[in-house]
A protein has these predicted regions:
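Intrinsically disordered, low-complexity regulatory segments in eukaryotic proteins
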Residues: 442-446
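Extracellular, repeat-based ectodomains that mediate carbohydrate processing or recognition
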Residues: 20-441
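C-terminal outer-membrane/trafficking sorting elements
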Residues: 4-6, 11, 15, 447-525
Length: 525
């Protein structure tokens, strides 16, 4: 109880567990924040990083830029916002995507481009400190890598975390820009030097397993497996290959030099509301290379449902679709904007946007919530659906626009971390939820305000000495320093404006200093 009261007083970790979900506005943008991504460090599950598209005024223009924040305490507090650079006058950014390697080195890919004249590409930045800082991004794809196809839309970045010869290899999949008419193909590139250089662009589909001439946006959903394979699922419609529209599963053991192909799913298509966010995802079990999970919205039974398919033989064969959402079948309430994640034990959490709580049906003027379900058997069955958003969100026409097509989640132990965009406050912002999945309880999160008018800390990170300089004279002012467990590790009383603390023997990590009600974070390295 003492520890609970201490952390509550500091407003940086658990406030309480509530039956009613709690959500935190993590972006606080003035107009538009969209399409967030969330990554967890495999070498430190308390290190989370989120990235999103946010409006920024720069050089006399309002442009979309990629913004990031990092957490080192499981999402209880977050760093100040970083902004990734643009690479041309009038450029805007989109589609952030991140991946940690097995050692905790973080990569971020994003688009930076403009139209008329078309220019730009896909860029990759790197962070060696858990997402606090980024190096200068390098270009992975150019707008003109394929003549007239502009292959820079919806890139997905994955990193090989295996202990095979492919360990550390980066892969990016992409597709032609939205304004490019078919025939189109899914593309990819490979990097073996942390994303500084890339192979020539190539297509994932192959002879006998072609995408075809009628699919406008053939997105490839990639993943790497624990045995060193690069895999992707992509759509196809070629009647000579299969009389039905279908998805193919491609896998490579040699860093994309060649692929094996298997049919994943084929079906008679049903009409779908094109306003729905129909993106799909492929994920791989963290310790069993045979287990894979594919999920996306499927418009049948008079509305869109979240459907999942799974494989237990490395993608050679797949189950039939399993309905994840448990509202009444065919009730006209559509689900979309889906994401999923395995935890360390191989359980799966699936999250999505859900309209079941609106009295009306359809898309326009229909409010929504966010829900999740858990599977303990690789997607064969699912738990009762649970609401994750803290309130019903009224419809706003901005949800029909581009730039808010995906949400994101990571899953560790029994804790589900999720980010999404919604319009509950009259603008599109990014919201964060930290949910104990088995009990559907959420942890109230406060974003630590690290600016104050009382004192400055430097250097930060500190190696030997931490300087505490006050902006005004002080008299007998107590200082307390806490570790991330909420324990007091140091205290003193100061009466000087300039003070120094020897931290050379302290354990490396993140600490919080509390002075006169002000709390600031610092790092000892």
């Amino acid at each position: 109880m003492k520890k609970y009261l201490l952390l509550l007083a500091l407003c940086f970790t658990f406030a309480a567990l509530f039956a009613q979900p709690t959500n935190t506005n993590i972006s606080n943008g003035v107009l538009f924040d969209g399409e967030p991504y969330l990554a967890m460090n495999p070498s430190n599950n308390q290190n989370l990083v989120t990235a999103w598209m946010g409006m920024k005024f720069s050089n006399g223009l309002f442009r979309i830029a990629i913004k990031t924040r990092a957490s080192f305490d499981g999402g209880n507090t977050w760093s100040t916002v970083n902004t990734l650079p643009h690479f041309g006058l009038g450029y805007g950014s989109a589609d952030p995507n991140m991946a940690f390697d097995a050692n905790g080195y973080l990569y971020l890919s994003y688009i930076d481009y403009k139209q008329n004249p078309d220019s730009g590409g896909i860029y990759v930045a790197r962070s060696g400190d858990g997402g606090l800082n980024w190096d200068t991004p390098s270009k992975a794809f150019d707008m003109y890598d394929v003549a007239n196809k502009r292959p820079i839309d919806r890139p997905w970045l994955v990193v090989d975390k295996s202990s095979t010869a492919n360990a550390g290899t980066l892969y990016i999949t992409t597709k032609p820009a939205p304004w490019i008419a078919p025939p189109n193909r899914p593309y990819y590139k490979v990097s073996s030097d942390s994303g500084h250089t890339w192979t020539a662009i190539a297509n994932i589909d192959g002879t006998g397993y072609l995408t075809g001439n009628s699919i406008t946006a053939p997105m490839a959903a990639p993943v790497t497996t624990i045995d060193g394979k690069f895999c992707a699922i992509y759509p196809s419609y070629v009647a000579s290959q299969n009389i039905l529209p279908c998805y193919y599963f491609a896998s490579s053991t040699n860093q994309g030099q060649s692929f094996n192909y298997n049919l994943m799913y084929a079906t008679v298509p049903a009409g779908a509301d094109t306003n729905l966010k129909s993106g799909y995802q492929l994920i791989a079990h963290p310790s069993d290379a045979n287990k894979l999970y594919f999920v996306g919205p499927v418009s049948q039974n008079q509305d869109a449902d979240i459907k999942a398919l799974n494989s237990t033989d490395g993608g050679q064969t797949w189950s039939g679709p399993v309905r994840v959402n448990d509202d009444p079948l065919g009730n006209g309430k559509s689900q979309d904007m889906v994401w999923a994640a395995y935890n360390e034990q191989g359980h799966i959490a699936t999250v999505w946007r859900d309209r079941r709580n609106d009295a009306a049906t359809g898309f326009w003027n229909i409010g929504y919530d966010f829900y999740y379900a858990v599977s303990d058997d690789n997607g064969q069955t699912f738990s009762t659906n649970q609401q994750m958003s803290s309130q019903f969100i009224p419809f706003d026409s901005i949800v029909a626009e581009n730039g808010n097509d995906f949400l994101s989640a990571v899953y560790s132990g029994d804790t589900l971390y999720t980010v999404w965009g919604d319009t509950r406050n009259g603008k599109l912002n990014i919201w964060f939820a930290k949910t104990i999945a088995s009990t559907n309880t959420t942890v109230d999160v406060n974003i630590l305000n690290e600016s104050n008018d009382l004192f400055n800390l430097f250097p930060n990170p500190a190696g030997r000495q931490l300087q505490i300089n006050f902006k005004e004279d002080v008299v007998s002012l107590p200082i307390e320093i806490f570790n991330m467990k909420g324990q007091v590790v140091y205290n003193l009383i100061v009466s000087e404006r300039q003070n120094s603390i020897d931290v050379s023997q302290w354990q490396s990590g993140i600490y919080l200093i509390k002075i006169d009600g002000k709390v600031q974070r610092f790092v000892v390295d």
